[in-house]
Design a protein with these regions (language model features):
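Short polar/charged helix/loop
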Residues: 1-175
Length: 175
């Protein structure tokens, strides 16, 4: 067993909801084996309040959560990523920066809870569902014997995880 800590970046377009949820989930559930980050291709500059509410209700950290541009992670000074996951279909379709470190990538697209219209209860329900889908994927990811898998096997397993319950149609096609 290794003491290596893996750097993981979650991407979506606005960096207000799904990627923020995933970052917080991995920070807590990664048990020190992972450094979690999130960013967006076109960040909105603020975190969706429903994302913060759901994370807090589930006992996940929200301090330091901020909407930021993915360019922060494409510089030579940025942490070298081991894994980069897109969690929205539009970010998966964009030309991503060249990430230092040549990370393993996968698309884990789920529906955008911030796009749900309706009552606050309906919006919160959508965020809880997104949280559940992401936590399920992250639980499987953190259980992988990363050190003992070759790159191709690891990439295939990450693709399979991305196709789990809640995957967008595009996530099933991209992977």
């Amino acid at each position: 067993m290794t003491d290596r800590v893996y750097n993981v970046l979650f991407l979506c377009t606005g960096n207000t909801a799904r990627s923020i949820l995933a970052e917080s989930i991995l920070r807590k559930d990664g048990m020190g084996r992972f450094n979690a980050f999130s960013a967006g291709s076109h960040p909105k500059g603020e975190v969706n309040p429903f994302a913060l509410k759901v994370l807090a209700a589930q006992g996940y950290p929200t301090e330091g959560a901020r909407s930021k541009n993915w360019d922060e992670f494409a510089t030579p000074e940025a942490p070298k990523m081991d894994f980069v996951f897109t969690v929205c279909d539009s970010a998966a379709g964009e030309a991503c920066p060249v990430w230092p470190g040549h990370p393993v990538t996968a698309h884990w697209g789920i529906e955008d809870p911030a796009a749900v219209e309706g009552t606050d209860i309906e919006k919160e329900r959508a965020f809880n569902l997104a949280f559940r889908y992401l936590r399920n994927r992250i639980t499987q990811f953190t259980a992988l014997p990363i050190e003992s898998l070759d790159r191709l096997t690891l990439k295939n397993r990450l693709r399979e995880i991305g196709e789990e319950e809640g995957a967008t149609h595009n996530a099933q096609l991209v992977n």
